[in-house]
Each structure stands twice: as C-alpha cells, then as structure tokens.
Amino acid sequence: MISPIKNIKNVFPINTANTEYIVRNIYPRVEHGYFNESPNIYDKKYISGITRNMAQLKIEEFINEKSRRLNYMKTMYSPCPEDFQPISRDEASIPEGSWLTVISGKRPMGQFSVDSLYHPDLHALCELPEISCKIFPKENSDFLYIIVVFRNDSPQGELRTNRFIELYDIKREIMQVLRDESPELKSIKSEIIIAREMGELFSYASEEIDSYIKQMNDRFSQIKARMSVT
C-alpha cells in the first residue's frame, strides 16, 4: 500500500531558507535520511549544497520562481462551483494543465508528477486557499513524486483522491499477479481494468474515456498477435 501524505490544510507562506523545513511543511513524514543525502540532479535546479539539510535555496530558481508561480496561480484561482462539467484529456495532459484545471474550478481533483520535492509549483499550490495535495513516491523511480491535488471546498475532492489512491494500489497488485508477463503487457492489462473509473475520477469526457480504452484494447491485440507469430 502506498502511504500518501496530505499537506497541512492551511500551509502558511514560508519565511525561511531552511531546506529541510520547507519540505516537511508540505510532506511531514518524509524520511529523515532523505535530508542527509546529496541533492540529486533535479534538486540542484532549486537548492545548492553538499547535503539537502545543509543546502541553500536558490534565490532566482526557487524563491523568486515560487513567488511568480504563486501570483500566477492566484490570478487563475476560482471558488469551487456547485457542479463540474467534463473536461478534455488534452486540458490536463501536462502538469500545469492538471493542477490548473483544479485551482480554476473545472474539476475537483487532478494528478501530476514532480522530479523534486523542491519544485516551486508544488510549494506554491500548497499555499492556495482550499487546495490540498497528497504526495507519495512514484514506484520504481528514484526521484519522481506523484502529486494528487484536490479541492477542500468540494466533498468530491478528497473522496476522488482517496479512490484514486485505491485504484493505484489495485493496479500495482494486478501487475504483481501478472509478474510473469512482459512489462508492456502488464502495464496495458492493468490499465484496461482501471481506465474507465480512473477517467471518471479525473472528470474526462465519456467519449474520450471510450476512445482511450479502445486504444488500449487495440494495443493489447497487437501485442498478442506479435506473440502468436513468435
């Protein structure tokens, strides 16, 4: 089971250069040993130092960039509507689109990944009113983190977030059951099983969900056809 951590409901603006504190502020249960490690190549975009707990925040790349991103997010922020309408997958196909559709009130929940816990967008999001994030490491990756961003002012926000996490675990369990299959086949089979409900959680239009599932089924058929030839 993954162990996501929800950020504090109201994360206050950070007036410190302590690189350990700013991460714990949004991800309280991060392992202590994480800060004794050297910054990875992605962290180095935002901090500099021998270890993370001894590092300094970069003025332009983190502090100023977070301020710019937070100002932009505030201009795009909208209170939660009473009803949500389906969105196109294209609107959420990149990280900014994923969180922008949430903070602008188009949908109650979205998901994206960051390559560093010092990513300015992540820290800016956590300072917005009625916006929360759940964070957990991406499986089989040394640096990626999955961020589930959701609305606190809609009951659908956390409900959908929790169900997303359940489906994520289900997919992992399916892939474990299929451990003797090829990585490609495991990925497609598990995706087909959860694709419809996952698409509905993300508020995608039903016709786009249908199209995506057909695409996955076609890929599955192509793989099976190749395997039958060999």
From Swiss-Prot:
User: What's the protein here called?
Assistant: Cysteine S-methyltransferase OspZ
Q: Which UniProt keywords apply?
A: Host cytoplasm, Host nucleus, Methyltransferase, S-adenosyl-L-methionine, Secreted, Toxin, Transferase, Virulence
Where does the record place the region Interaction with host proteins TAB2, TAB3 and ZRANB3?
49-52
The set of disulfide-linked cysteines is: none
Species whose genome carries this gene: Shigella boydii
The record's subcellular locations are: Secreted; Host cytoplasm; Host nucleus
Keyword check for Ribonucleoprotein, yes or no: no
- Which EC main class describes this enzyme? transferase
Q: Which residues bind S-adenosyl-L-methionine?
A: 92, 98, 107, 111, 204, 208
Q: What's its catalytic activity?
A: L-cysteinyl-[protein] + S-adenosyl-L-methionine = S-methyl-L-cysteinyl-[protein] + S-adenosyl-L-homocysteine + H(+)
